C-alpha cells in the first residue's frame, strides 16, 4: 500500500462511518453569537463559559501588553522568552489556587503531554479514567510506562488496579469536569484511594477552572482536594488560551529541567499573559461570581425544559450539556437542522466519544440570556 492509498483508506473509512471531521470558517466563534457566511447564530458550541472572550478590560490588557512587550515572546522561556508578565501571572495563579508554583504552557494539550512525558519511566504505571481527554491518554500511551484505564469514575476499579504490584511510581490521571459528558469526577474518593497506594494524582481541570467553586477555583477546590499535579487551561473559563501546571517548588524545578515542551517551545506572548492576568482578576471579583451565578441559572432553565425530549441527557450540572443521540448520521442531521433554525451546535462522534454515543455537545455560557435558552429548547422540541 502506498502513502496515498493509506491516506485515502483512512479518509474513506471515516466518511463511511459518518465520522469525518470538518472545520467551518467563522467570522466570530466565541461569545453569545457565532457569525458564519454573513449569518448570525445563537452559539451553543463555544467553551467561553463565562463569556470573557470579548470582555473590554481583557481586550484592553492584551492591547496594552502588545504595545509594551510586542506581539511575540521571542523565544523559549529558557532563553529570552520568560517575561515579567509571565512571572506575575504564574505567581498570581499559584496564590489563587494554593500552590507553591505555577508553570505556563502554550496549551492544555502541551501541558498534559509535557508532564506525563517528563514524569513517567518504564517501571512506572499510569492509571487513567478511560474517558480522560485525548491529550492525557495519548501522552500515557506514548510514555514508556504501563497504562491501565479504570471504568469512568469507578473508584473501586481504580483501587483494584492500584493494588496490583508496580516496581515504580503510580500516577492517577483524571479530568475534573469531563469535556464530553460534563460530569464531575469524585476527586475526594479518588485522592483517598491514590494516597492509600502511595501514588500521585494529576487532575486536568480545564473545564472547571474559573467556572465552579469559590472564586472559580475549580472542581478540586470545590471538593477540598489538592492533587500533586493540577492542570488548568485558559481557553475555557478564562476566555483566552494557554495553560498552567500547579505543583510544588521541587516539581516545578524538575519540570523546568525535563519537560521538553517548556524547554523547546516558544513561550506565549507576554501580551497574552497580561490578558490572562486581567481575566483572572475578573474571575476572582464580584463580577466573576455574578457570571457564575447566571450560568447556574441558565443551566437549570435548560435542564428543566429538555427533560421530555427523546434523547438521553447526560447527568451534568456543568456548562457542558450533552444530548446523547446515538447514531452518527442522526446526530449530524439534527445539528444541521438546528443550525438551519439559527442555533449553532456541534455533533460529536466517535472516536472522540465511545461508539454508539454520538451526541450534540451543547455548551451554555454566561453570555447567553434566558430567551436564548428558551429558543434552543423550542428548536430542540421541534426536531425531537
From Swiss-Prot:
Quote the Pfam families the UniProt record gives: Aminotran_1_2 (PF00155)
Instruction: Spell out the molecular function terms from Gene Ontology.
Output: 8-amino-7-oxononanoate synthase activity; pyridoxal phosphate binding
Which N-terminal stretch is annotated as signal sequence?
A: none
| PROSITE patterns from the UniProt entry | AA_TRANSFER_CLASS_2
Q: Which domain of life is it from?
A: Bacteria
* Pathway info: Cofactor biosynthesis; biotin biosynthesis
Disulfide bond residue pairs: none
- Tell me the InterPro entries matching this sequence: Aminotrans_II_pyridoxalP_BS, Aminotransferase_I/II_large, AON_synthase_class-II, AONS_Archaea/Proteobacteria, AONS_Proteobacteria, PyrdxlP-dep_Trfase, PyrdxlP-dep_Trfase_major, PyrdxlP-dep_Trfase_small
PANTHER family on file: 8-AMINO-7-OXONONANOATE SYNTHASE (PTHR13693:SF100), CLASS II AMINOTRANSFERASE/8-AMINO-7-OXONONANOATE SYNTHASE (PTHR13693)
- Write out the similarity annotation: Belongs to the class-II pyridoxal-phosphate-dependent aminotransferase family. BioF subfamily.
**HAMAP family with a match to the protein in the record:** BioF_aminotrans_2
Q: What does this protein do?
A: Catalyzes the decarboxylative condensation of pimeloyl-[acyl-carrier protein] and L-alanine to produce 8-amino-7-oxononanoate (AON), [acyl-carrier protein], and carbon dioxide.
The protein depicted here goes by the name 8-amino-7-oxononanoate synthase
Q: Which gene encodes it?
A: bioF
Amino acid at each position: 500500500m502506498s502513502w496515498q492509498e493509506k491516506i485515502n483508506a483512512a479518509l474513506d473509512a471515516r466518511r463511511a462511518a459518518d465520522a469525518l471531521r470538518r472545520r467551518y470558517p467563522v467570522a466570530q466563534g466565541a461569545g453569545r453569537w457565532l457569525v458564519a457566511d454573513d449569518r448570525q447564530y445563537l452559539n451553543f458550541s463555544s467553551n467561553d463559559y463565562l463569556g470573557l472572550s470579548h470582555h473590554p478590560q481583557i481586550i484592553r490588557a492584551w492591547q496594552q501588553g502588545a504595545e509594551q512587550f510586542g506581539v511575540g515572546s521571542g523565544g523559549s522561556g529558557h532563553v529570552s522568552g520568560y517575561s515579567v508578565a509571565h512571572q506575575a501571572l504564574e505567581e498570581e495563579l499559584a496564590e489563587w489556587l494554593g500552590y507553591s508554583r505555577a508553570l505556563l504552557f502554550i496549551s492544555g494539550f502541551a501541558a498534559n503531554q509535557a508532564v506525563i512525558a517528563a514524569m513517567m519511566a518504564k517501571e512506572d504505571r499510569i492509571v487513567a479514567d478511560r474517558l480522560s481527554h485525548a491529550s492525557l491518554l495519548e501522552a500515557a500511551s506514548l510514555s514508556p510506562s504501563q497504562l491501565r484505564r479504570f471504568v469512568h469514575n469507578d473508584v473501586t476499579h481504580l483501587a483494584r488496579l492500584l493494588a496490583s504490584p508496580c516496581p515504580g511510581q503510580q500516577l492517577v490521571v483524571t479530568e475534573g469536569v469531563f469535556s464530553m459528558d460534563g460530569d464531575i469526577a469524585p476527586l475526594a474518593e479518588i485522592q483517598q484511594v491514590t494516597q492509600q497506594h502511595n501514588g500521585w494524582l494529576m487532575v486536568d481541570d480545564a473545564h472547571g477552572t474559573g467556572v465552579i467553586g469559590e472564586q472559580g477555583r475549580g472542581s478540586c477546590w470545590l471538593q477540598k482536594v489538592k492533587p500533586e499535579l493540577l492542570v488548568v487551561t485558559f481557553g475555557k473559563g478564562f476566555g483566552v488560551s494557554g495553560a498552567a501546571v500547579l505543583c510544588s517548588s521541587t516539581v516545578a524545578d524538575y519540570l523546568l529541567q525535563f519537560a521538553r515542551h517548556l524547554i523547546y517551545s516558544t513561550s506565549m506572548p507576554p501580551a497574552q499573559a497580561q490578558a490572562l492576568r486581567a481575566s483572572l482578576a475578573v474571575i476572582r471579583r464580584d463580577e466573576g461570581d455574578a457570571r457564575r451565578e447566571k450560568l447556574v441559572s441558565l443551566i437549570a432553565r435548560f435542564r428543566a425544559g429538555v427533560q421530555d425530549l427523546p434523547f438521553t441527557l447526560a447527568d451534568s450540572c456543568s456548562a457542558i450539556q450533552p444530548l446523547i443521540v446515538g447514531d452518527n448520521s442522526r446526530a449530524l442531521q439534527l445539528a444541521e437542522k438546528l443550525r438551519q433554525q439559527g442555533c449553532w451546535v456541534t455533533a460529536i462522534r466517535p472516536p472522540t466519544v465511545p461508539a454508539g454515543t454520538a451526541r450534540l455537545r451543547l455548551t451554555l455560557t454566561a453570555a447567553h440570556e434566558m430567551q436564548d435558552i428558551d429558543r434552543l429548547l423550542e428548536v430542540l422540541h421541534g426536531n425531537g
